Amino acid sequence: MKPTRVPKNPCFSSGPCAKHPGYSIEDLNDAPFGRSHRSKPGKEKLAEAIKRTRDMLGLPSDYLVGIVPASDTGAFEMCLWSMLGCRGVDVLVWESFSKEWATDITKQLKLKDTRVFEAEYGKLPDLENVDFKNDVVFVWNGTTSGVKVPNGDWIPDSREGLTLCDATSAVFAMDIPYHKLDVLTFSWQKVLGGEGAHGMLILSPRAVQRLESYTPAWPLPKIFRLTKGGKLNKEIFEGSTINTPSMLANEDWLATLKWAESVGGLKQLIQRTNENLAVFEAFVAKNNWIHFLAETKEIRSSTSVCFKVDLSEEKLKELIKMLENEKVAYDIGSYRDAPSGLRIWCGATIEKEDLECLCEWIEWAYDLVK
């Protein structure tokens, strides 16, 4: 029987992700429109975004946070190009974005002393093979495969190389041991549903030391430069961005952080995300035609949740189109490079009731197209 209720918000995209419940464009009226980002009010707004982010995540006091251009991609690229090359590199690959980082390191930077550990979709490489005398590059959560690292236990507290982690679909949704990460990047448009084009960069003291003691052999474009005269450009981490940010997008980020504070902060964001995943765990347990792409529960993502469905690719496309036409689910097809299936965002801005409702519609559509 066709469901009678529909999700209040049918946006289940894995990026840009759904706006938080109660979102209003009116919340952005305090943005310093028409003012320079280097003016006092402009810089204060950017510094506020940095401080609220730091406080929400509970970062170590000696870690630095900055706003940088070009989303998570820009943030991570600037670190790869600025920091790698002075020692060997181990890269972990198990989905599209981690594969792109490996391509950058081996084909663009052409670092010969590089080991790539690759696993197919749904699996993780063997983490025990990683050598922390090398710099280690990995994603915390594979956004296109629905597979995450189980925890940080495989990373030693004492290590010679740096750990560079793309955590864009993990921050604000998963427990992350920051002291095990030297570089951590993310974008605004993932777990908290902010706007695109801006990245955030978090550096440990060890990462700063690398920047100040090592100069790559290749030229760096302006938007990748984190140092001036061999010293860290600390102004970047105080609200003085490398180039012009969108003050509207920054105001939107402030609004999302205020919402996150209002629902109980980081602990509650993680709980909301886990409760959302539990909806699908119950749904998969009840239906033998839908399966998690992640092979085991301990590596199953709680944000970008990926599924295999017992349908042909043609029938699956029909199911996805049907749900879109009914205006109950947008953008839930698997990533273009991933195995055919569904990918449904379960981060903190998604309401559990909407996912429960979506499950009814998926079941209805499956019965029609199978």
UniProtKB/Swiss-Prot annotation:
Q: Which residues form the signal peptide?
A: none
Which Gene3D superfamilies does the record match to this protein? Aspartate Aminotransferase, domain 1, Type I PLP-dependent aspartate aminotransferase-like (Major domain)
Task: List where in the cell it is found.
Answer: Cytoplasm
This protein's source sits in the domain of life called Archaea
Sorted UniProt keywords: Amino-acid biosynthesis, Aminotransferase, Cytoplasm, Pyridoxal phosphate, Pyridoxine biosynthesis, Serine biosynthesis, Transferase
| Keyword flag RNA-binding | no
Task: Name the major location.
Answer: cytoplasm
**Free-text cofactor note:** Binds 1 pyridoxal phosphate per subunit.
* Cofactors that this protein relies on: pyridoxal 5'-phosphate
> At which positions is pyridoxal 5'-phosphate bound?
101, 143, 166, 189, 243-244
Q: Which GO terms describe its cellular component?
A: cytoplasm
Q: Does the keyword Kinase apply?
A: no
EC numbers for this chain: 2.6.1.52
| In-chain residues carrying the UniProt-annotated modification N6-(pyridoxal phosphate)lysine | 190
**Pathway assigned in UniProt:** Amino-acid biosynthesis; L-serine biosynthesis; L-serine from 3-phospho-D-glycerate: step 2/3; Cofactor biosynthesis; pyridoxine 5'-phosphate biosynthesis; pyridoxine 5'-phosphate from D-erythrose 4-phosphate: step 3/5
Q: Which residues bind L-glutamate?
A: 38
GO MF term list: O-phospho-L-serine:2-oxoglutarate aminotransferase activity; pyridoxal phosphate binding
The protein's annotated catalytic reaction(s) are: O-phospho-L-serine + 2-oxoglutarate = 3-phosphooxypyruvate + L-glutamate; 4-(phosphooxy)-L-threonine + 2-oxoglutarate = (R)-3-hydroxy-2-oxo-4-phosphooxybutanoate + L-glutamate
GO terms, biological process: L-serine biosynthetic process; pyridoxine biosynthetic process
Q: How does it assemble?
A: Homodimer.
Write out the similarity annotation. Answer: Belongs to the class-V pyridoxal-phosphate-dependent aminotransferase family. SerC subfamily.
What this chain does, per the entry, is described as: Catalyzes the reversible conversion of 3-phosphohydroxypyruvate to phosphoserine and of 3-hydroxy-2-oxo-4-phosphonooxybutanoate to phosphohydroxythreonine.
Name this protein carries in UniProt: Phosphoserine aminotransferase
What is the source species? Methanosarcina mazei (strain ATCC BAA-159 / DSM 3647 / Goe1 / Go1 / JCM 11833 / OCM 88) (Methanosarcina frisia)
Q: What is the lineage of its organism?
A: Archaea, Methanobacteriati, Methanobacteriota, Stenosarchaea group, Methanomicrobia
